[in-house]
Amino acid sequence: MLNMVGSVLASGKNESFKLQYRVVAQDSLASAMMLGLANEDTAFIFDKVENNKKKTASGRPTWASLVQLSDYSVRGIDATTNPFCAAGTTLGNGSYIVVGGNSAISYGGINVKNSDGSMNLNGPAPPYNDMDGRRVVRMMQPNADSSKLKWIDDFDSPNQMDSPRWYPAIEGLADGSVVMIGGATSGGFINRNYPNVDPVYATSSSNPKAGVWDQGGANPVSYTHLRAHET
């Protein structure tokens, strides 16, 4: 983990301000796919599901951690669903919200199969025991006590989104709620070598809808189709 610090370099009568990085922690326990401020003394890190060495209390690899900015100590916290390529922002009440992500995965980011040969997209998927994150709305509520900071991350929550979103966009609104826009229905990249005959739905792999989440935690509402334009 790096911290940017400023130093004043004297050169004759002129002084210049130089920014430089210094290492403050050798191991953040998880890669910072997402990084934010949870309170005045704590930063949160959110990674995709992968086989990080440090395990949490649940036995899963750590893909979420907290960093104390006073001494740069790091501790892992539990997360349940796969937030790979999710979107996040701050609600008007100070909570941090992370929506969408990828399906449950195994080694190498691949999906596993059920005993009947069907794909196990929901999870839990061995060896990480992760759950599908594509419809999940995760929340970290503000708390001055860093020991009480945690992710509300429930695969089967009644407050999940109405449809799956991988790589969506999210934007805060003036009333403190957020709008969630678009995304794909599952993770992955398709480099087409043929015309896109379905620019709106991309033959079921696109989610051309917008949804609104209010800061009280109501289920996403006001879904409308978006127009997709291609040249």
Where are these regions (language model features)?
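Beta-strand-rich domains and repeat architectures in extracellular enzymes and scaffolds
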Residues: 24-59, 84-86
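Residue-level detector of Asp-centered blade-edge/turn motifs that repeat once per structural unit
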Residues: 38-40, 91-93, 172-175
